[in-house]
Curated annotation (Swiss-Prot):
Descriptive protein name: UDP-N-acetylenolpyruvoylglucosamine reductase 2
Its EC number(s): 1.3.1.98
Top-level taxon of origin: Bacteria
Location of the FAD-binding PCMH-type domain: 31-198
Similarity comment text for this entry: Belongs to the MurB family.
Catalytic residue positions: R176, S256 (proton donor), E357
Cofactors demanded by this protein: FAD
Pfam family, one: FAD_binding_4
Function recorded in the entry: Cell wall formation.
Source species: Corynebacterium glutamicum (strain ATCC 13032 / DSM 20300 / JCM 1318 / BCRC 11384 / CCUG 27702 / LMG 3730 / NBRC 12168 / NCIMB 10025 / NRRL B-2784 / 534)
Keyword entries, A-Z: Cell cycle, Cell division, Cell shape, Cell wall biogenesis/degradation, Cytoplasm, FAD, Flavoprotein, NADP, Oxidoreductase, Peptidoglycan synthesis
Compartment list: Cytoplasm
Main location: cytoplasm
Amino acid sequence: MDSSLAQEIAAIDGVELDSEVTFADLTTLRIGGKPRSAVRCQTTEALVSAIKLLDDASLPLLIVGGGSNLVVADGDLDVIAVIIETDDVSINLTDGLLTADAGAVWDDVVHLSVDAGLGGIECLSGIPGSAGATPVQNVGAYGTEVSDVLTRVQLLDRTTHQVSWVDASELDLSYRYSNLKFTNRAVVLAIELQLLTDGLSAPLRFGELGRRLAISEAEPHPRRPVRMVRDAVLELRRAKGMVVEHTDHDTWSAGSFFTNPIVDPALADAVFEKVGEPTMPRFPAGDGKEKLSAAWLIERAGFKKGHPGAGAKASLSTKHTLALTNRGDARASDLVALAKEIRDGVLETFGVTLVPEPVWIGISIDD
């Protein structure tokens, strides 16, 4: 941006210009080159004002929250990084409504809700990133999705630069998807969640978490105290390297890298016949489809934890095959090569195409 525009943006209360930051600093993968410039916004008003000025100048923007769902190319990038640092969270204990600014750390939001005795998002504990990203990809884990509790989102329309609250029903929310994903038409400014007020979790599914909580398959609509569920989820995620720890390279990742594939029953049957394991995970996915486990497919295609082994710059986590990790000095090209190897290996073995979950900036899995 030219100096006059930079001065105008810097004059906005709550804005700080940053000429040194890289995307390696801004993402949980710790990979990525340098933006043309970066604009840090500490208030919603500052965020709206800065984006309007930058849009009016027709500059390419990348809106960055927690950086947990980004794969960014190496080198210098012709983009302005707008970093959302708004972090207010408000809770109405009477009706269970929680409102969070887009820049609030998601796990802090979950922690606050649990401390307040509110249920509904405890299964989403430990997920990295910001609150504003959760509706964009409809974040989910252990049988819970943000769409289960999301009532509305506050959006900045990038065309009109008007701010409005939009009902969750207008977002086309589905498995790891909303109509905000892969588009620059709007920026999430805040989210509103309707939570439960009786101190218990949302109904839990039997499975890994259910076994940890001693839930029986025969127990109808099981619920547990929210803190008990949060603690169990964090234990499970830490064991898989899915809670960010700066000293643990298994957590230098974008979380679950591939979505669980939704396939026709005939393809699921073919996978079952090929592997012959009676415990193959497969679940109803609606519309006559079935959901398979991406991690299970990766392992059965011959890719073990830690693949391709010690010394690799990018590898599968040593704790969980669904996380692609930076072992310390990986470049974007290293991660792309690994992602392509995994995707192509599963396709060749099972005929199932794995779809990456992160957003790609300046690079793609086919590069």
